[in-house]
From Swiss-Prot:
Reactions that this protein is recorded to catalyse: oxaloacetate + ATP = phosphoenolpyruvate + ADP + CO2
Cofactor(s) listed: Mn(2+)
Binding site for substrate: 61, 195, 201, 322
GO biological process, one term: gluconeogenesis
Described function: Involved in the gluconeogenesis. Catalyzes the conversion of oxaloacetate (OAA) to phosphoenolpyruvate (PEP) through direct phosphoryl transfer between the nucleoside triphosphate and OAA.
Group of enzyme by EC: lyase
Family listed: Belongs to the phosphoenolpyruvate carboxykinase (ATP) family.
S-S bonds: none
Localisation per UniProt entry: Cytoplasm
Pathway: Carbohydrate biosynthesis; gluconeogenesis
Residues noted as binding ATP in the record, renumbered to the chain: 201, 220, 236-244, 285, 322, 447
Name of this chain's protein: Phosphoenolpyruvate carboxykinase (ATP)
EC code: 4.1.1.49
Amino acid sequence: MEMFGVHNPATELATVGLGGAASVRYNFSAAALYEESIRRGEAELTAQGALRAITGQHTGRSPRDKFVVRDSNTDGEIWWDNNKPLSPEHFALLRADMLAHAAGKDLFVQDLIGGAEEGHALPTRVVTEFAWHSLFIRNLLIRPDAAALPSFAPKLTIIDLPSFKADPARHGCRSETVIACDLTNGLVLIGGTSYAGEMKKSVFTVLNYLLPAKGVMPMHCSANVGPNGDAAVFFGLSGTGKTTLSADPARTLIGDDEHGWSENGIFNFEGGCYAKTIRLSAEAEPEIYATTQRFGTVLENVVLNERREPNFDDGSLTENTRCAYPMDFIPNASETGRAGHPKTIIMLTADAFGVMPPIARLTPDQAMYHFLSGYTAKVAGTEKGVVEPEATFSTCFGAPFMPRHPAEYGNLLKELISRHGVECWLVNTGWTGGAYGTGKRMPIKATRALLAAALTGELGQVEFRADTNFGFAVPVSVNGVDSSILDPRSTWADKAAYDAQAEKLVSMFIANFAKFEGHVDGGVRDAAPGVKVAAE
């Protein structure tokens, strides 16, 4: 077996059963991985210098093909209602077959770190069949100093072989695609998919399992920090404005997707960003756009024209087009990936029912309730001729990546909020003046003004009212914001229609939360909609 690149001889691939590979390229640089990707026909160079790859059949994650090994360690710790179990015997067969499949192949290895806080960092080795996957994960995770590579000892290993096809009958999985996580032994096996995001989210899943046992809260969120060290965390599902609202030229970006909250403050899990690019423009998001126009960035499933220029308006391959780039490609990104304890937590929702106010203050109990609910609303597909919004509840604002029971994360979050006196706000970026179809989208200018008022503390000085549906506190007036939009009912022409819509949404919240009732205390249960008590 030929070996190239700097690595620790004591942890060579032979130690995990990959000694039969034809060659191994350890910790290759971006330039070397460009050469390998293009030479092997995996990817192509764009006119501006980025590397474009197409993932084929899988243009997104495959949550139905993700499994967790159920053994004596994980049996009582994993939320099996939301995680699919795989027996240790099936995993052993899968591992043996994947190792055999890798024999004779050229493999690429990156030795990286998950977690910017040293005491909670996860040394991670990612072994890939594709050179461009090696560049992708090198961009996304934290790169250790070159001097640390000769002694690097991974605690998590990910083996990513897109050409491997699983056998459901033999391996206990659902299809030819498989993402299998052995949390006890720190091994993730990915086969049958070329979608690079599976690697990134596998690291997130493992950290989400490991950290709560150490009292560290893992979060699916973006985060930034102001010039006075006032950190803010933004929870939110896809399409709620998490990336857009945390990108603030007056504040330093900590990260855009995954963070931990420890005894020392917040820290990024990653060293890069994985941003959506569909309909990306230089005018609307100049910093992200600029990353797509340079060497080092990976473009995933982005259509190129005949001049090899990306067309971000073309979703013919998928609407889920992406770019992956290191954090230092963003001008105002944090160099450390760390900040102190958050002063403010923002929970974003895009309420397409038009019921929720644009901003509301939450007590710690209400914050835990809305964190466990993880609500947003998607607009139904126009091709079906349906204009009724669809409520989406993804607990902890990231259910697919949470191995433990949601109440474990929720209780930890509530405890940290109370201990550090964090202000919590629910911000609705959805519809006002009616539901989707009759109302209009919440003006981004108003959202930014309300957010700024929350972050600066200005909202602490205004008068509040209790929301009659959700019980949280809503400001009556805010400088620079049209007061009418602060009361959603007043923006509807038909008040009876608003009341009916509100009653419908409240009933959805209550029905969704029923599964958590037995896992939370009375204070959180009393934070349910319909309890008309405002935050003090």
